[in-house]
Amino acid sequence: MTSGILIASNVLLWGAFLALAALMLGVIRQIGLLHERSAPLGAMMIDHGPDVGERSPIFNVNTFDGEPVLVGRSITPGRPSLLMFTGPSCPICQKLLPIIRSVAAIEETDVILISDGTQAEHRQFLKDHPLDGELYVVSAEIGMRYQVSKVPYGVLLDQDGKILAKGLCNTREHVESLFETIREGHSTLQNYLKDENTAPKFKQVTANKVH
């Protein structure tokens, strides 16, 4: 009799524990969705690396295909460069790749994808997402010098290697904001939104976009 009661109580306790665990997972998921929906409309600076207005450090590296490239200066003379820090296992980076290509083509900007990880991961990434004019560089050093802690993260350089804008890029609006802030005469999204003349226009434009 006593053993039966103990077994029943244990079953009830485990049932309550599993129900509580399922409830907590649901709450965590909802918090994540809320955080995503409330994310800033533009690329936000979260690193402590080289500042906007400074010239980028120079890195003599090779692309994943073994071609030498000078990261930190223009790839094509007279054209700006977008350094996009990514990861082979980053789903947002994979989703953002065609958007980066589209925006870069409109802005006539060269793209350098900078990543880290194992050779096998990069081979699989490039197999699933073939390059289309971008350079692909595997270098932990560049990310460390820029102190990038989250990806995808973009750094826009002018033709002389000066940092024009930078920030976390999770959406098309984030990528576009790197260029938009410069056109409006601001170095960062934060300064752009502080401007009483440009902030309302920026918010109106992003509100009218269809996602």
Curated annotation (Swiss-Prot):
It is found in: Membrane. One of its GO terms (biological process) is methylamine metabolic process. Gene3D superfamilies: Glutaredoxin. Pfam families: Thioredoxin_2 (PF13098). It is a single-pass membrane protein. The chain crosses the membrane at residues 5-25. It comes from the Bacteria. Keywords: Membrane, Transmembrane, Transmembrane helix. Signal peptide: none annotated. InterPro entries: MeN_DH_accessory, Thioredoxin-like_fold, Thioredoxin-like_sf, Thioredoxin_domain. Pathway: One-carbon metabolism; methylamine degradation. SUPFAM superfamilies: Thioredoxin-like. GO terms for cellular component: membrane. Residues 50-187 form the Thioredoxin domain. The keyword Acyltransferase does not apply. NCBIfam families: MauD. May be specifically involved in the processing, transport, and/or maturation of the MADH beta-subunit. This is Methylamine utilization protein MauD. The lineage of its organism: Bacteria, Pseudomonadati, Pseudomonadota, Betaproteobacteria, Nitrosomonadales.
